[in-house]
Swiss-Prot record:
This is Glutamyl-tRNA(Gln) amidotransferase subunit A. InterPro entries: Amidase (IPR000120), Amidase_CS (IPR020556), Amidase_dom (IPR023631), AS_sf (IPR036928), GatA (IPR004412). The lineage of its organism: Bacteria, Pseudomonadati, Pseudomonadota, Alphaproteobacteria, Rhodobacterales. It holds the Pfam family Amidase. The gene is gatA. GO terms for cellular component: glutamyl-tRNA(Gln) amidotransferase complex. GO terms for biological process: translation. Belongs to the amidase family. GatA subfamily. It comes from Ruegeria sp. (strain TM1040).
Amino acid sequence: MSDLNKLGLAEARDLLRKGDTTSVELTEACLKAIDGADALNAFVHKTPDVALDRAKAADARIAEGDAPAMCGLPIGMKDLFCTKGVDSQAASNILKGFKPEYESTVSQKLQDAGAVMLGKLNMDEFAMGSSNETSAYGNAISPWRREGDETPLTPGGSSGGSAAAVAADLCLAATGTDTGGSIRQPAAFTGTVGIKPTYGRCSRWGIVAFASSLDQAGPMTKNVRDAAIMLEAMCGHDAKDSTSVDLAVPNFEAMLTGDIKGKKIGIPREYRMDGMPAEIAKLWDEGAAMLKAAGAEIVDISLPHTKYALPAYYVIAPAEASSNLARYDGVRYGHRATLAQGDGITEMYEKTRAEGFGHEVQRRVMVGTYVLSAGFYDAYYNRARKVRTLIKKDFEDVFAAGVDAILTPATPSAAFGLGEMNDEDPVKMYLNDVFTVTVNLAGLPGISVPTGVDTQGLPLGLQLIGRPWDEGDLLNTAYALEQAAGFVAKPAQWW
């Protein structure tokens, strides 16, 4: 069977169980696709030997009849996850050559479930970015192009390599992480599905930290069913992460009935921003109409503190980043600068960080250090934390009033061209996160579902936000939206 790499997780799982294909065949198809897609710069560390060894082991396990759902399925791993003996550098020069001695909990769970790791995926450096342009590996490039235009487009960020790889059928699915929208925005830009689960649902242990109170891992897949299958394998309690919650993990796939009759879907009026492109507003209205036609009740809701979310996020996230990134000092691991005669420890720190950190990371570390400094701690950091509490309360009030899920746009536009925002004020790039950061600040689950295309043929996504710990219900609502939207567009192969 040709084109095995074009399958989704559920389809491939069913073929494996029937004996119609093998994990080795699936893996070889993906490895061939990866080797033919260097122009996308999605896979930055290829691990064909690891992949084929795991595929052979998975085939043996399937033959014995004790295989979990993910067994034998080839996936990509975002470079933010530590993978034992395999380069894990968070797309930063400061971690060049770093091969961890341990495996992150999420990647270990996937490995234990029999998933096959094809390699590590490009991303924004330390997950700081919305376009995959801050990577030490160079830009990841979207497989999508505007109709009649060869301008290379961003796959989004920070999980840009994951989104590009899934959209281009280089793997069946991929892991991502989401601190302010880094799963959902790239998914929307590439016509894929991305879910950020409730904060604490997936362990953060072994994931290189950006902002510890916001970071959360999740799957990036070709459809909602695949997201349900992969999320179940990724989450679960981990004693090594103090924020990991000890809750039973439901069978998310079994909850996908598509029945949303009587569900209350909230439409937040504050998300209708000035200058919102007509295409995004129209898509949002169409999405609400689709859910209504499926039997849901659409209600107008208010999230009054929404306008403060972006500034609060861009105080809290850099503050936590400046603390987390203090560990990269050239002493224990990663890059160490060459020192001049007479240089001491201070010069080693300065030179190592100047050489190792890219501009955006340096900017965020500086902002974070500033807002945590003695004179500004109360004015910025403490105030942002108070705003965060109010944003969380807004959502709690809406859910307490009986709303089951909230529908919003995922992004303020379709994918933009690489370099298009480079000369701009960085705040313009930060505005890409305007619809997604509230979900991280409130610790809620959010999913991006491809729902349509713009006038130039580029994919557009809508976001659904769910109650905490209710990913099953959220996935089912997303499944109903996916069925109604009937999105099947794929990028035309140019690479």
